[in-house]
């Protein structure tokens, strides 16, 4: 079945690719038959070759300002709407919806994924019912870590908005990410919530993970930027909020809460149970904080805890202990 033809009119389109100016000649698609919500005679977007848009299925480029070229592939029932650009080997299939977005450089988008007002670039795989919206940027790059072949992936029911996800990061499950910068091999999954704002993004990098029902939330004050680095993890029902930096071998789990700041945890730190850390606190070198333990630095004060130590039960610490008391 031939569902469209190419108009005879040629259109030249110029664009920048990695700093190089390129141009391509495009022809407009014209529907030949009625299918889905498209009627015969309807003009659509512009492509450089018939191989770009499949003659099978209900896939269609709806907007006359939308472009697809340079080895791109649009198949199945995929829809491309508004002024979108699909180029350079990008593969769009199944029931994907691309709306005012740019997809390029071998990105693969499948199943029921929605991309709105965002950029997807590089070798990555988006699948399931994932959503990328709100001016987000997904920039994949392999070969920057020991896992050279790992693809950046976003899948299941994950939602990303107003964020940048780059390199080889993995976002999946029912994770929700808003105003965040996630890079390297970081992972956010399960029902995790990563919530920044217009003032401050959340930063998750290296091999850090956020999962379970954990929440990582930025504040609106200056430097109220939660930062997860190296192998740090926030899990279960834990909450990390504000100016908190988690570094080597840190796990915050249970119903633990970190808030205020500046808080820094480094070198084999475990915070779990219903433990609470508030204010300007530095915790380092093999410390476990569990149970109902409460560590709080009041305004103008700072607490420094250095292990090895175990702080548990209902212990309450409001100042740096004298050596040997803990």
Annotated model-derived regions:
Residues 1-58, 62-64, 77, 88-89, ...:
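Terminal amphipathic alpha-helical/low-complexity segments used for targeting or macromolecular assembly
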